[in-house]
């Protein structure tokens, strides 16, 4: 019997965050907390099923599921691939972090972790993919129509006012003037998109309300600012304090090269004077909604806050952008968050429009021609 350094018998148990699927006639088991995958033959799958709780190696060997000559090597391999945990080793911190999402797992935890740190294809690679495959890949229809149903035409909208103007003017910009934005402009955009406007007396604790909706008023979204060229603010990485309406400096300025790493495939966004990251503190939502569907609330809420951010920037005549193609772990390392309890979900930024340009949707070249829809 194998014993730990303290002389105690070593116990093993199946890892708590495993998802299995058949692929190419092989069962593959994925520990989504550690990101490690392994092919598992039937006899080893049966061995794992015996380890629902801490089990001694002696009892496991006695089950006869694996030939005695291969037993020790099999256990070592399962531990190395993080499919088994040993009682004499410290828990992996990633596993402990994923445990905090327990009531959402495996659905939300698996989706959250397996969609991080994606390798994004360059636009030119996507355009050439159909040619490489020997077939044309046509895009789906841009709109949906019911051809066999009656449609009632609506009156034209009353599109007067500042909000309607901002909604119509909002565009994604990919080129920016070298002029800085002002601290007043940044403060206005942050206050009216992410700042706490009022506190409501709740049964247990005061409840914050912002300009964007949040399921159960949980307001799980946090905002971080990467200030690169703001008149009146030292370059650096800041956390926005929504109640105090202030910026807390948490790290030195990111280099331009580092900022480009944040947005793989969209490096031109790093030229903006300000980049903003929207994260979610999942515990706030979990406290009230212990079912996996509530993970969607975190995604939607980040979108609400970001849209408010973009509209406020547009109303001030600034050039905003938003992007979801992110280098998650690089960003989270620089923000000092673990990516599980609190994770980056979305990014945006603001700059000034380049001189003489009505819209710069492309990193270089002229903007495409625009045809306005006369119905709206």
Regions found by a protein language model. Give the residues of each.
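Long, low-complexity, charged/polar intrinsically disordered regions in eukaryotic proteins
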Residues: 1-35
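Glycine-rich, charged/polar anion/phosphate-binding loops
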Residues: 5, 13-16, 205-210, 225, ...
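Long, charge-rich, low-complexity alpha-helical segments
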Residues: 23-26, 33-157, 318
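Residues forming anionic-ligand binding surfaces in small-molecule and nucleic-acid pockets
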Residues: 147-175, 279-291
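Active-site pocket-lining segments that scaffold enzyme catalytic pockets across diverse folds
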Residues: 183-232
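Glycine/small-residue-rich phosphate/adenosyl-binding loop
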Residues: 214-305
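Short conserved catalytic/interaction loops centered on acidic-Pro-aromatic/His motifs
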Residues: 288, 313-341
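C-terminal helix-cap and adjacent tail motif
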Residues: 343-376
């Amino acid at each position: 019997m194998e014993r730990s350094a303290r002389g105690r018998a070593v116990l093993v148990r199946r890892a708590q965050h495993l998802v299995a699927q058949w692929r190419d006639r092989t069962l593959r088991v994925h520990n989504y907390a550690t990101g490690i995958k392994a092919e598992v033959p039937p006899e080893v799958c049966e061995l794992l099923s015996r380890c629902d709780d801490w089990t001694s190696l002696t009892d496991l060997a006695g089950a006869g599921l694996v030939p005695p000559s291969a037993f020790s090597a099999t256990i070592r391999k399962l531990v190395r691939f993080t499919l088994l945990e040993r009682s004499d080793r410290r828990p992996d911190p990633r596993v402990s972090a994923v445990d905090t999402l327990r009531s959402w797992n495996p659905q939300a935890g698996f989706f959250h972790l397996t969609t991080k740190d994606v390798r994004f294809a360059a636009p030119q690679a996507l355009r050439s993919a159909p040619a490489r495959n020997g077939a044309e890949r046509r895009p789906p229809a841009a709109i949906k129509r019911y051809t066999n149903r009656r449609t009632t035409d609506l009156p034209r909208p009353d599109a007067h006012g500042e909000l309607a103007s901002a909604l119509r003017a909002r565009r994604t910009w990919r080129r920016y003037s070298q002029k800085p934005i002002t601290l007043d402009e940044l403060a206005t955009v942050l206050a009216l998109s992410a700042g706490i406007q009022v506190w409501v007396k709740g049964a247990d604790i005061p409840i914050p309300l912002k300009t964007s909706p949040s399921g159960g008023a949980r307001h799980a979204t946090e905002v971080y600012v990467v200030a690169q060229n703001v008149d009146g603010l030292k370059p650096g990485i800041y956390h926005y304090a929504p109640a105090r309406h202030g910026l807390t400096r948490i790290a030195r300025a990111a280099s331009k090269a580092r900022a480009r790493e944040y947005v793989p495939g969209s490096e031109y966004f790093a030229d903006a004077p300000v980049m903003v990251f929207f994260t979610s503190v999942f515990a706030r939502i979990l406290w009230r909604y212990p079912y996996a569907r509530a993970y969607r609330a975190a995604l939607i809420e980040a979108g609400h806050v970001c849209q408010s951010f973009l509209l406020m920037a547009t109303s001030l005549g600034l050039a905003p952008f938003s992007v979801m193609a992110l280098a998650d772990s690089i960003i989270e390392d620089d923000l000092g968050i673990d990516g599980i309890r609190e994770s980056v979900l979305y990014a945006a930024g603001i700059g000034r429009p380049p001189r003489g340009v009505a819209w710069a949707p492309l990193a270089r070249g002229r903007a495409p021609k625009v045809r306005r829809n006369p119905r709206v």
